[in-house]
């Protein structure tokens, strides 16, 4: 009986993950600004992880710039900047690795205090790189005020969301008329050296 309940619980969590990825994909294909897409993804992450804070930083040359956040940090969007090697977020960008700290994240030697963001009020920290075309283009952070043991599912979800955000950024770089006018079959076939028939 206990095994059946455990399997049922795991199945429910997988269904929740699938619904999350579906909702994120729907944001990505809508005719919305990139800021609206990122804010929508942040809202979904907060709902799914029950975190207290979700932040998306994107690269601007050698800096990471806060570009999306749940309501606690809206005034800081576009204003908070850090170097690619600064703080926990910068470490994730530089190392291209997920980082999970379950408690006292502010005591980690990589932690950097930013006056604009009260990040030292959060105990737990989970962060994943945002990757587009195999390059780090940003970082997505999830923070909890209380200690929180991040499980493998949460880490996997945040990693996948980092990849989805990277895809959204890559797609956003294409002009809308390009998406409509491009011969998609020719584009794909030419990438593997096949010429489409005339």
Locate predicted features:
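Amphipathic alpha-helical coiled-coil segments that mediate homodimerization
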Residues: 20-28, 33-52, 56, 88, ...
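Signal-transducing coupling segments at domain and membrane junctions
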Residues: 74-75, 102-124, 144
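Allosteric cytosolic regulatory segments
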Residues: 159-166
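GAF sensory/regulatory domain recognition
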Residues: 43, 53-80, 84, 104-107
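Short beta-strand-to-loop transition segments that serve as allosteric relay/switch motifs
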Residues: 72, 139-148
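Acidic/proline- and glycine-rich, intrinsically disordered low-complexity segments
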Residues: 75-99
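Signal-transmission linkers at sensory-effector interfaces
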Residues: 1-30, 35, 137, 171-197
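A short, aliphatic-rich beta-strand micro-motif
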Residues: 123-131
